Design a protein with these regions (language model features):
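Patatin-like phospholipase
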Residues: 1-45, 57-308
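Gly/Ala-rich beta-loop-alpha elbow adjacent to hydrolase catalytic centers
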Residues: 47, 51
Length: 308
């Protein structure tokens, strides 16, 4: 497998799939291409939002099935918003609230759940509502934070968190859930970006999109007294960088494809992913997102990509 000057992808011990809706098909194409060239998935995987489902498809070797199911569901869906049948077009909700769970069921069944249990460790992030009485305030703050956090490159160290007012980041493990419906619910919760996908109740508590709190998962203990620990040192030697690798779904023009930020390793798309994040109709270009991922993986394997 390809090495660059400071990085050997075979040394990655934890692979993180960030969220991004349909942009996560770039991750699917990228990793599927690496696997086709002989790479083996690390045994510790973390997924956020749609990235969690993509990770599950790669673990269970159902990525093609998941992509086909997505395209079929989108082809049968007339629009982003669902309307009540009748003469008056009364909106009743967002289509993804039905499409997304149906998509998960199309490629994650009992056999696939057994593969996830036998794989190693798959965790998905979600944002748990801690104070129901402040639900509206917590969600509004989370949405604004999420929009601000899209450009996490410019965030200061103190702006990363695993807890904000009313919400806490939690790691859910589908392999520990039984029956299958409860395992699927962890993936639904991780992508529950209200109002597009409604919150999911797990163990009596409401859970929302994992990306509401942080654009990338923040592990317990990474922040002490508002400061990052040594593994997030900005001056970390590239040769000693973390063996954790995060696959982004946004393109930052000031960064190369492979880069370090606060001591963490990231791979980003070579350009803006050509797909609508929340699109769910026949004209949603998920194939283009997947294809860009494949092309970027091929470029990654055959060229020397220097970190900053």
């Amino acid at each position: 497998m390809h090495n660059n000057e400071h990085f050997n992808i075979n040394n990655v011990s934890t692979l993180i799939f960030s969220g991004g809706g349909n942009r996560c098909w770039w991750q699917a194409g990228f990793v599927a291409e690496l696997i086709s060239q002989g790479w083996t998935l690390p045994k510790d995987i973390i997924g956020c939002s749609a990235g969690a489902a993509i990770a599950a498809s790669l673990i269970t070797d159902t990525t093609d099935k998941a992509l086909d199911a997505c395209k079929h569901l989108y082809a049968d869906n007339p629009g982003l918003i669902r309307y009540k049948r009748g003469a008056l077009k009364i909106p009743v909700g967002f289509a993804q609230n039905e499409v997304y769970p149906n998509w998960l069921k199309a490629f994650i069944g009992e056999e696939e759940l057994a593969k996830i249990r036998a794989f190693g460790r798959l965790r998905v992030t979600a944002s748990r509502l801690d104070r129901p009485s402040f639900r509206l305030v917590a969600i509004m703050r989370a949405i604004f934070r999420h929009l601000h956090g899209k450009d996490f490159i410019i965030l200061g160290q103190s702006e990363y968190a695993h807890k904000i007012a009313g919400l806490s980041q939690v790691f859910l493990e589908p392999a520990q859930r039984q029956p299958l419906s409860e395992a699927l619910q962890t993936f639904e919760a991780s992508a529950a970006a209200s109002p597009f996908i409604l919150a999911r109740r797990i163990a009596g508590e409401l859970h929302y999109d994992g990306g509401y709190i942080s654009p990338i998962p923040v592990f317990p203990g990474e922040r002490v007294g508002g400061n990052f620990q040594s593994d997030l040192n900005l001056n970390l030697d590239p040769g000693e960088a973390s063996t954790t690798l995060t696959l982004l779904t946004r393109h930052f023009e000031t960064k190369p494809m492979l880069f370090s930020h606060y001591g963490k390793r990231f791979i980003q798309p070579s350009r803006k992913i050509p797909v609508s994040t929340w699109g769910c109709t026949a004209d949603t270009t998920v194939d283009d997102a997947y294809g860009l991922g494949q092309n970027d993986a091929q470029h990654f394997l055959r060229t020397s990509i220097l970190t900053n």
